[in-house]
């Protein structure tokens, strides 16, 4: 549209750039902190431009024995734990929700609606609301300090099921009729037709769930006492506490950077899918 | 709800829903009912005997000044985070909507805080505001403000509000931008021909037409502020100083796991449960009532 | 005075030029239709007049003012969009009043104008409804109402009838024409439908690929098309084009048949003959091998090929006529119905 007010365009870009600066500032500072040596990081004020110690800090953080004063596993080990947990949660949620949505939408069986509402109820029970009792259950089942304990209690929530249900409802009936004529039974239909048609949604959901899983904090905090099982997101808090005594901010910030990188990378790389998934899930 | 063309009943659907139902029962329904049950109990200090006391735990809570303060604090916190985060996102999305090319670039650069865990966000902000080393205390000192959120309750609250809002801007921005981009261009052009300038167009047309999104985000942001911010509090202030940043969800954790007051913590959980249910019902009600074109 | 002058207009997106030196003079009160196939640039041209697209080169004047630099709101124009662009959250009354409200016209005056427009368009019972409660035709009228109340110097229409069903389209077409005649406002109307163009316009501007093929009255375009494009675009069914040679006042077709005519053209030509200008005649020069006949009731369309060639032809005959497949029927062109075009440029050859 013709708008002979070029000043407005300038303001637009200025505001947006300001927004980006505000949004990116904490991450920039973290990055800068991760590139200096420990001594520099104890002098106020902290630097605003990167230093030269990036690789040094990187290797020391990744393979070192953890920060002094904390009880954490080596960082590479924690990254692995986080990865395992995030993948299990994401893939677990997707798998369970796919088959549940399939059953609810495509089968007429007794108690169908009862199951539907049961699943719906989980939307209203985030983990923070049931932490103590859930902890007890997990402990009773002997699942503390395990990958199973980290992931299973989190994979039954309803958002994924609802999204798949919505997707399945929009698939034309003729698909099923034509598959039946071709002789496909329910599982065949599910595997050969439904899943390929839902591919983009599965991918979008994967991004969201991976981030959800990776960023879990309260739950891993509660159920892991074994240092080998700590996740990297958990460890940040402990490192902050350790900073009271012997501040090694460069290591802490490098760890924070490493903790942030995988989810941020996944979001940016699959941005289009992610946005689509987000704006369609929460409806 | 059910497809017109569907399969008849058999063993298969039960097998398909079994995993989710099983996990739901074991890890959701059972613990939730346990929480409700425990909220009616008082255990003695050694955990040896339990007494069924009906609503006594709830009565104690309602009379507990600290609990009420925490409740009020949480509401304040929620409102501040929602207003700050949604307001900034609205402005940014409004400007991004005007950019013909490059809207996607700005979006890419804006969305990464979504991927950052709340506890990490807290860590980053506490680092920036560290009383001895942080860049902001340094700058604030130059204008005569002494920053130490370890001692000053209001400053601590301000810090967690900013950290929580910062993280949510990305999410709100995405939804607002999507809503604005779904408004037909010809509508805006018609308003321009009618004589409305950019500000007028935004106030008269764009903002009213994205009101469903605003309602939706209000609920989402409220739920976020109530529950997902545990990590931020834990990382930044641990509820302090002097409980000035203890919001409800943090109190549940603190009283339960650290203070070992199982009955009281369970009662708090139940109250939170009721709140979530109320908010979820509101959310679904509003989504049903979407404004039609 | 609200005449419109288009002076050598060029529109380019980056390096791609989409409108090439479009020029024309529109008189006050004229109803001009810009017509052409999809992608020919007609909407772009309209939007340039409206101020919704920038002008790369050339000038647009409304009345005495050059308006290139003016915002849409300052050009004193009103526009009816293809999808009506009504404000969904406002009532019909508020939709129509909006532009006046912004210009700070008094409440009484606004009410008066809105009621007047509502009367003309028969929208009285709907004034307090929202757009989603109206039918397509009603929404269309609200869009026009919004334009009328502004009393602008120019009306701009961007394919306003495309979203209506065929019957409604015919009805609304007439209403738009009557309205414009009554109000006497200079109007530019864009459409891809040549029937709409012929019935609505005082003059038509035919655009093709960003070029103005011809700018004249409907009858001018029908009787003396300037190019093969215009000849084939105006008139339905479309004109028949036959390769031929002209010499000494007569035209010889590819199969040797000779048609007498007047004129000084000679050399290879493209002969244009409208389907309705061929009269059945036992001894006529134009002989067609029949493929099939479409019966339309009022007339019949005969499809076939020029005898001895592969060239497809259509002949329109009045009333119910039938013919057997593979039969040959002979025709004579009516007087003055031969159109000769240059086979390479497509331009009309002067007679």
Swiss-Prot record, chain C:
Transmembrane segments: none annotated. One of its GO terms (molecular function) is ATP binding. Its EC number is 7.6.2.10. CDD domains: ABC_MalK_N. InterPro entries: AAA+_ATPase, ABC_transporter-like_ATP-bd, ABC_transporter-like_CS, ABC_transpr_MalK-like, ABC_transpr_MalK/UgpC-like, Mo/tungstate-bd_C_term_dom, NA-bd_OB-fold, OB_MalK-like. One of its GO terms (cellular component) is ATP-binding cassette (ABC) transporter complex, substrate-binding subunit-containing. PROSITE patterns: ABC_TRANSPORTER_1 (PS00211), ABC_TRANSPORTER_2 (PS50893), UGPC (PS51315). Its main location: membrane. It is found in: Cell inner membrane. ATP binds at residues 36-43. It is a peripheral membrane protein. It catalyses: sn-glycerol 3-phosphate(out) + ATP + H2O = sn-glycerol 3-phosphate(in) + ADP + phosphate + H(+). One of its GO terms (biological process) is carbohydrate transport. Signal peptide: none annotated. Keywords: ATP-binding, Cell inner membrane, Cell membrane, Membrane, Nucleotide-binding, Sugar transport, Translocase, Transport. Residues 4-234 form the ABC transporter domain. The complex is composed of two ATP-binding proteins (UgpC), two transmembrane proteins (UgpA and UgpE) and a solute-binding protein (UgpB). Part of the ABC transporter complex UgpBAEC involved in sn-glycerol-3-phosphate (G3P) import. Responsible for energy coupling to the transport system. Belongs to the ABC transporter superfamily. sn-glycerol-3-phosphate importer (TC 3.A.1.1.3) family. This is sn-glycerol-3-phosphate import ATP-binding protein UgpC. It comes from Ruegeria pomeroyi (strain ATCC 700808 / DSM 15171 / DSS-3) (Silicibacter pomeroyi). The gene is ugpC.
């Amino acid at each position: 549209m013709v708008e002979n007010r070029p000043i407005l365009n300038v303001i637009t870009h200025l505001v947006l750039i300001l927004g980006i600066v505000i949004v990116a500032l904490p991450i920039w500072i973290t990055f800068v902190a991760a590139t200096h040596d420990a001594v520099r990081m104890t002098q106020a004020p902290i630097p605003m431009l990167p230093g030269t110690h990036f690789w040094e800090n990187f290797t020391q953080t990744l393979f070192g024995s953890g920060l002094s004063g904390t009880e954490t596993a080596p960082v590479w080990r924690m990254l692995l734990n986080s990865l395992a947990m995030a993948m299990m949660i994401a893939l677990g949620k997707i798998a369970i929700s796919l088959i549940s949505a399939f059953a609810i939408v495509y089968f007429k069986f007794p108690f169908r609606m009862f199951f539907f509402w049961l699943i719906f109820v989980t939307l209203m029970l985030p983990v923070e609301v049931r932490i103590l009792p859930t902890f007890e259950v997990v402990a009773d089942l002997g699942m503390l300090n395990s990958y199973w304990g980290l992931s299973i209690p989190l994979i039954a929530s309803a958002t994924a099921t609802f999204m798949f249900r919505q997707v399945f409802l929009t698939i034309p009936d003729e698909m099923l009729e034509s598959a039946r004529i071709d002789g496909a039974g329910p599982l065949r239909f599910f595997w050969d037709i439904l899943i390929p048609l839902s591919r983009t949604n599965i991918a979008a959901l994967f991004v969201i769930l991976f981030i959800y899983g990776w960023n879990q904090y309260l739950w891993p905090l509660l159920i892991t006492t074994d240092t080998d099982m700590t996740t990297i997101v958990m460890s940040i808090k402990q490192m902050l506490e350790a900073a009271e005594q012997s501040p090694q901010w460069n290591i802490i910030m490098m760890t924070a950077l490493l903790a942030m990188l995988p989810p941020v990378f996944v979001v940016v790389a699959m941005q289009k899918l992610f946005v689509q998934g987000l704006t369609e899930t929460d409806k | 709800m059910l497809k017109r063309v569907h399969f008849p009943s058999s063993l298969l659907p039960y097998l398909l829903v079994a995993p989710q139902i099983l996990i739901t029962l074991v890890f959701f329904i059972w613990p939730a009912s346990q929480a409700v049950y425990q909220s009616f109990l008082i255990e003695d200090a050694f955990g040896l005997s339990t007494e069924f006391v009906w609503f006594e735990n709830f009565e104690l809570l309602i009379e507990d000044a600290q609990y009420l303060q925490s409740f009020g604090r949480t509401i304040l916190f929620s409102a501040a985070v929602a207003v700050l985060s949604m307001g900034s996102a609205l402005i940014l999305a409004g400007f991004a909507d005007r950019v013909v090319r490059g809207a996607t670039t700005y979006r890419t650069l804006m969305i990464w805080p979504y991927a950052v865990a709340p506890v990490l966000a807290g860590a980053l902000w506490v680092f920036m505001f560290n009383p001895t080393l942080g860049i902001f205390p340094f700058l604030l000192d130059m204008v005569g403000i002494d920053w130490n959120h370890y001692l000053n309750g209001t400053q601590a609250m301000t810090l967690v509000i900013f950290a929580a809002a910062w993280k949510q801007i990305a999410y709100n921005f995405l939804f607002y931008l999507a809503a604005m981009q779904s408004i037909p261009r010809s509508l805006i052009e018609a308003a321009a021909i009618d004589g409305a300038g950019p500000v007028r167009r935004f106030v008269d047309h764009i903002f009213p037409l994205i009101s469903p999104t605003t309602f939706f985000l209000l609920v989402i942001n409220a739920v976020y502020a109530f529950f997902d911010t545990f990590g931020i509090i834990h990382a930044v202030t641990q509820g302090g100083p002097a409980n000035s940043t203890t919001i409800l969800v943090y109190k549940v954790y603190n009283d339960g796991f650290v203070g070992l007051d199982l009955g009281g913590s369970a009662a708090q959980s139940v109250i939170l449960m009721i709140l979530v249910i109320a908010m979820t019902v509101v959310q679904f009600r509003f989504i049903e009532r979407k404004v039609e074109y | 005075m609200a005449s419109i002058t288009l002076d050598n207009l060029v529109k380019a997106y980056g390096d791609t030029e989409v409108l090439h030196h479009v020029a024309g003079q529109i008189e006050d009160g004229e109803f001009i239709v810009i017509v052409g196939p999809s992608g020919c640039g007609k909407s772009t041209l309209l939007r340039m007049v409206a101020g919704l697209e920038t002008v790369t080169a050339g000038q647009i004047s409304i009345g005495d003012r050059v308006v290139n630099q003016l915002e849409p709101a300052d050009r004193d124009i009103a526009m009816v969009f293809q999808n009506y662009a009504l404000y969904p959250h406002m009532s019909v009354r508020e939709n129509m009043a909006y532009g006046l409200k912004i210009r700070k016209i008094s409440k009484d005056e606004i009410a008066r104008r809105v009621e007047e427009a509502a009367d003309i368009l028969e929208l009285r019972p709907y004034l307090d409804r929202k757009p989603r409660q109206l039918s397509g035709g009603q929404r269309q009228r609200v869009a026009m109402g919004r334009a009328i109340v502004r009393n602008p110097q120019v009306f701009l229409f961007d394919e306003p009838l495309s979203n209506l069903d065929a019957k409604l389209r015919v009805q609304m077409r007439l209403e738009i024409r009557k309205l414009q005649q009554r109000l006497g406002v200079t109007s530019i109307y864009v459409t891809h439908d040549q029937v709409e163009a012929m019935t609505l316009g005082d003059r038509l501007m035919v655009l093709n690929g960003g070029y103005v093929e011809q700018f004249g009255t409907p009858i001018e375009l029908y009787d003396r098309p300037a190019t093969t494009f215009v000849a084939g675009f105006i008139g339905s069914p479309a004109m028949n084009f036959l390769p031929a040679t002209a010499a000494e006042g007569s035209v010889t077709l590819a199969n040797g048949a000779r048609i007498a005519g007047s004129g000084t053209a000679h050399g290879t030509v493209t002969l244009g003959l409208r389907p309705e200008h061929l009269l059945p005649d036992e001894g006529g020069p134009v002989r067609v091998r029949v493929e099939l006949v479409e019966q339309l009731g009022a007339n019949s369309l005969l499809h076939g090929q020029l005898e001895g060639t592969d060239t497809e032809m259509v002949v329109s005959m009045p009333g119910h006529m039938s013919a057997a497949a593979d039969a040959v029927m002979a025709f004579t062109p009516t007087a003055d119905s031969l159109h000769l075009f240059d086979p390479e440029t497509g331009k009309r050859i002067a007679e």
